[in-house]
Design a protein with these regions (language model features):
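Active-site cores that bind ATP or allylic diphosphates and position pyrophosphate for catalysis
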Residues: 2-398
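Glycine-rich phosphate-binding loop of ATP-dependent small-molecule kinases
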Residues: 188, 192, 319-323, 331-503, ...
Length: 581
């Protein structure tokens, strides 16, 4: 710690870690890297690596060894005894793990484009009990909990631990002036004479309630304010960080001059509630903050499949208080802020008196108002914030949408899709693209066969193209067989962050499809000439989550297309003539 920043809170563990090596060593690593196995980092691993290299995760010097991992899972302590609540691990495939020898192997850590970012000196390789990890860290093994689901179902099955030597942090080309490392932020605090700094963590746009909460917190502890939003991985379905950052920039002027600062944090959140609140505070401590705001349901993932919250509304505050001395950061607890209509002001909900008229808009209602193009009241947020949100979340009739057909060969998917295409082209408004199963096979997936693996690849390709069309405000009509439920769900999750996704199940029976057999495929399948034929020798998993179900044994193609159009109208994806103009 330099003399100029000595008045700030000390980093966790006493020293701010910096893992970037000298230039000459970088050249040496590049020369030797061809001898080492390479690992392409996932999105989460990229975020973790950046904060390891810059010291945001001080005192960690690399991905955790087994001793540190076990200590963190079981009692929130590193092997050294220092408090640390969250496992920071490098998960790899079994095939990759088998190549490694603890004590001698080195790994070239690369970004998805192949740029080498760091060297990992392998100290430990082990297969963790990921369900036990989820239970310890998240107090849940439910797939409805995004953190637990990632640990159990999405992370690779083997962990590699060891010290890191950094060559560069992952490159960023957006908001560069706001991406301050712990050392850079500490230097800014020192330059401006900030000694007491309270950090406000957020993964959502800020509205009037958040501004009031942050202002009150800073005033209460007589500190300057750091607005420190997460711009790494957050909860699925969150507003994209580009939109959020534009909103944060607009709101800086709402705070007294020279008392608030905005900086971006490339963190991959885990949504671990109480444990995550402590983790967030330690990270802000490393960035020079002496205080940390913990609000209602801090870093909570919402509710489980039974509608019960995973964590209590103020469980994070209670948990933080127990460990506050070890954290080394003072908590500033706050209740949820609510608007009192008669007094035209925001107050914590524990200050509401009998007879007060309280107004509030939930995140779900806000998104619904944006989708429907409805007014968002000035008491809730600022006009400039609404304007930014409307750019990213236009009314539904202006959004992109994917209409994704699934059904057996010969069920009528392509015919209905073509009728739908002509109706959209006739009315105009948005560009329309038809991704027919046979045409995609011909032009995009000609090298693929019909094994389960190849079918999945084909559908994911279609999903990716459809997501790009949807993202850019167009209509994508997809008409593959898409026999597997998990793959269809993957495509839905790929597209829904960008616009609408309508799953249309053409539920025509195999008997009717076989009677039609325009291409003679069923006859060949029955004769054993065609192997792995859906509905005969390969299974078709009927969807339980279809938005529209159609049986072409009962409806004509025109009638079926009209049913889909009516559904799109009900959901708001087709506006009136005046709205579409």
């Amino acid at each position: 710690m330099t003399a100029s920043t000595s008045h700030l809170v000390a980093p966790h563990g006493g020293k701010l870690i910096d893992l970037i090596v000298p230039t000459e060593k970088i050249s040496e690593f590049k020369a030797h890297s061809k001898e080492w196995p390479s690992w392409d980092l996932t999105a989460r691993q990229l975020c973790d690596l950046e904060l390891l290299i810059t010291g945001g995760f001080s005192p960690l010097r690399g991905f955790m060894t087994r001793a540190d991992y076990d200590g963190v899972c079981h009692n929130m302590r590193l092997a050294s005894g220092v408090l640390w609540p969250m496992p920071i691990t490098l998960d790899v495939t079994e095939e990759f793990a088998k190549k490694l020898t603890p004590g001698t192997s080195k790994i070239a850590l690369r970004d998805p484009e192949g740029v080498m970012l760091a060297v990992l000196h392998v100290e430990d390789v082990w297969q963790p009990d990921r369900k036990a990890e989820a239970k310890a860290v998240f107090a849940s093994t439910s797939a409805a909990h995004p953190g637990a689901d990632y640990a159990i179902n999405k992370a690779n099955p083997w962990y590699v631990g060891g010290k890191i030597e950094g060559m560069q942090i992952p490159p960023h080309y957006d908001f560069r002036n706001l991406r301050l490392t712990p050392a850079e932020l500490r230097a800014e605090f020192a330059r401006e004479g900030w000694r007491r700094v309270v950090a406000f963590q957020t993964r959502n746009p800020m509205h009037r309630a958040h501004v009031e909460l942050a202002f009150r917190a800073a005033k209460q502890v007589e500190a300057n304010l750091l607005i420190h939003p997460v711009v790494g991985m957050t909860k699925p379905g969150d507003v994209d960080y580009y939109t959020r950052v534009r909103c944060y920039q607009l709101l800086l002027s709402k705070f007294p001059q020279s008392t608030a600062k905005l900086s971006l944090l490339p963190l991959a959140m885990r949504m671990a509630g109480p444990r995550e609140a402590i983790w967030h505070a330690i990270i802000r401590k490393n960035h020079g903050c002496s205080h940390f705001i913990v609000g209602r349901d801090h870093a909570g993932p919402g509710k489980d499949t039974d509608g019960r919250p995973f964590y209590g509304p103020y469980e994070a505050q209670e948990f933080f208080k127990k460990h506050e001395a070890d954290i080394g950061v003072t908590m500033v607890p706050f209740n949820m802020m609510v608007y009192l209509e008669d007094q035209d002001k925001y107050v914590p909900d524990d200050e509401v008196k009998n007879g007060d008229r309280v107004l509030n808009i939930s995140g779900t209602e806000l998104r619904q108002r944006l989708n429907e193009g409805r007014e968002i009241p000035a008491w809730f947020t600022y006009p400039e914030v609404v304007s930014e949100l409307r750019k990213s979340f236009p009314a539904r009739h202006k959004q992109g949408v994917t209409i994704f057909f699934t059904g057996l060969s010969g069920s009528g998917k392509s015919t209905i899709a073509n009728v739908l295409l002509t109706k959209f082209l006739e009315t105009g408004g948005r560009p329309v693209t038809l991704l027919d199963g046979d045409l995609v096979r011909k032009h995009l997936s000609s090298e693929l066969g019909f094994s389960k693996e190849h079918r999945d690849i084909n559908i994911r390709r279609i999903g990716y193209v459809a997501s790009e069309i949807t993202k850019n405000g167009g209509i994508a009509i997809c008409a593959p067989i898409a026999p597997y439920d998990a793959t269809r769900k993957h495509v839905r999750h790929m597209i829904e962050p960008y616009g609408g996704f309508i799953l249309v199940h053409i539920a025509t029976t195999v008997e009717v499809c076989e009677q039609r057999d325009r291409k003679g495929l069923y006859a060949k399948a029955r004769a054993g000439i065609l192997k792995e034929f859906t509905g005969i020798s390969d299974p078709y998993e009927a969807p339980s989550d279809a938005d529209v179900v159609i049986n072409t044994g009962e409806l004509s193609a025109e009638e079926a297309a009209q049913e889909i159009i009516l559904h799109l109208e009900r959901e708001g994806f087709i506006g009136t003539t005046a709205e579409s103009a």
